Amino acid sequence: MKHAFKIFGLCAMTLSVPITANAELLALLNYESKIGQPNRREGIAVIDVDPNSPNFNKIIKDTPLPPDFVAHHIYYNRDTSKAYVTSLGHSELYIYDMAKFPDSKTIVPVPNCKVGEDITFSADKKRWFLSCMGSSNIIVGDAQTDQPIGTIDSGDSPDKFIKYPHGIMLNNDLDRMFVTSTVNPSNPNDAGETVTIIEASTLKILSTHKLSTKPSPSGEAPVEILFAPDQNPPMAYIDNMYGGTLWTATWRPQSRDFGFHEVFDFVGTGQSLPLEMGFNDKGDRLFVTTAKPGAFNIFDIAEPYEPKLLATIPTAGGAHHFVISPDNRYAFVQNSFINLPEMDDGSVSVIDLTQNKVVATVDVLKKAGLTPNCIIAMPSWHKHVH
């Protein structure tokens, strides 16, 4: 950038303090320069996103990242003591001790991983699994030492394989891990159409399933997997990024495998590129963002195999990750999808879920020529939406 990035509202405070009577909601946002900006910059900012806070839309802390890191996602481990930052540009993980953020950081090399995407953690806090879209494999790590301890390779079978993995989700009770086949990072026109099931305890690839009713190659690009709460038998939602559809995967106890069905199509809604999903606390609402033209969708899933679209709330181009406030009042939607044209707005839309409308905008990064790639609440405000 031409000008030094200004830190707004810098204050000496402990970021892990509990919620007080003062309005405040601190979130981590990893950011990068918008395309065309000189002197490319990356970093992670702590921003107050609570519209009722006196520090709303101000950066509280800021820490730099290498300008070619291309930080993508931020994940907490099971007890939110550590934040894992994945990289599209480096074969590394940056891991932050959240009690000392950003001063305590560990850089973990993952040399066999190209284009690191999503992470899922085992319930016993012993392992993590990193999807690597560029190398078509999964890295297994020790969640205590954070050192890589294994690799799940792409597989040799034409009907059981890992290819361009992005979304990854472990169901500990079933000992099953889902991995999507999304898109070749070197060629966005080369998209997958499947999900693969892995036995987590043995790291064995069990099966691969096509999620499309179209002839192959359909290029549907399944992107994320989300197990619905309190379902018996267990079931998950999967969204197809290019296909614009939602599918379900339902556990079949007798055969110990999954059945797959399409349950919603975004065709006719004026939206495309469904990305992130999440649930409300009761588990009767499913939230789905769509990147183009940018919206936050609310589904009634009281009948989980017949999701009903209740509301579509326009946000801005590139609607992607989101955070729900601890009181369930607000959704905070990060509007940028890997800095793509028309999907790189750079703002965060604050949605009042009692009114289903945008009531405020966090644009401190956007005004600085930056765009966020992910948002996650700081540990004191964090709640799991999946």
Predicted segments with their positions:
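Predominantly soluble domains enriched in secretory-pathway, periplasmic, or organellar proteins
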Residues: M13, N22-H386
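N-terminal signal peptide c-region/cleavage motif recognized by signal peptidases
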Residues: S16-P18
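A generic structural signal for short, non-catalytic loop/turn and secondary-structure boundary residues
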Residues: F8, A21-N22
